[in-house]
Amino acid sequence: MFTGPIVAVGEYVEGLGEGRRYVSIPYYRREIERVIGARPFPGTFNVRVEREERESLRELASSYGYRIEPHGEYGGAWLYPCLVNGRPAWLVFPDLTEHRDQVELISETELRRELNVIHGDMVKIEVWGPSTWKLARRLTCGPSGGR
């Protein structure tokens, strides 16, 4: 079983506002809150990575991550915990996306401001295997792991 870490380095890119709309829809906001244990900042943090890296991260998320089922026109998504420049965040892989060379991240805070980055800055994304992050969730969220 994979324990990690996988490290992907990519370029922060400004989005088009699709993530903000998605996160602001009550159904998705509630589901994201259920998974991450906090109210998400209304928007996503987009990072351009190599397609192979994106596909590896997506495969990990769809194998071991949390599923948000489709609802309405936006479809579903897979979520998987990560660190971006050392800060906790969640990778989001929507079923419907135009960004084949990007990964989207969500957090309870505005990552762009928290990390003090601008369009074009390089960031590091780190992910671990499910046994590692499930243990971390139990230690920080209690025995239920935040569920």
From Swiss-Prot:
Per its Swiss-Prot or TrEMBL entry, what cofactor is needed?
Answer: Mg(2+)
Residues recorded as binding Mg(2+), renumbered to this chain, are T44, N46
EC?
2.7.1.161
Which keywords does this chain's UniProt record carry?
Answer: Flavoprotein, FMN, Kinase, Magnesium, Metal-binding, Nucleotide-binding, Transferase
Molecular-function GO terms, alphabetical: magnesium ion binding; nucleotide binding; riboflavin kinase activity
Q: In what pathway does it function?
A: Cofactor biosynthesis; FMN biosynthesis; FMN from riboflavin (CTP route): step 1/1
**Catalysis: reaction(s):** riboflavin + CTP = CDP + FMN + H(+)
Matches recorded under Gene3D superfamilies: Riboflavin kinase-like (2.40.30.30)
Q: Cite the binding residues for FMN.
A: T97, E104
One Pfam family for this entry, by name?
Answer: CTP-dep_RFKase
Q: How is the cofactor bound?
A: Binds 1 Mg(2+) ion per subunit.
Q: What biological-process terms (Gene Ontology) are attached?
A: FMN biosynthetic process; riboflavin biosynthetic process
Q: Which residues form the signal peptide?
A: none
Stored InterPro entries:
RibK_CTP-dep (IPR039063), Riboflavin_kinase_archaeal (IPR023470), Riboflavin_kinase_CTP-dep (IPR023602), Riboflavin_kinase_dom_sf (IPR023465)
Q: Which residues bind CDP?
A: G15, L16, G17, E18, G19, R20, T109, E110, L111, R112
Superkingdom of the source species: Archaea
Biological function: Catalyzes the CTP-dependent phosphorylation of riboflavin (vitamin B2) to form flavin mononucleotide (FMN).
Membership in a protein family: Belongs to the archaeal riboflavin kinase family.
Show the HAMAP family listed in the entry: Riboflavin_kinase
* Protein name from the UniProt record: Riboflavin kinase
Species the sequence originates in: Methanopyrus kandleri (strain AV19 / DSM 6324 / JCM 9639 / NBRC 100938)
Gene responsible for this protein? ribK
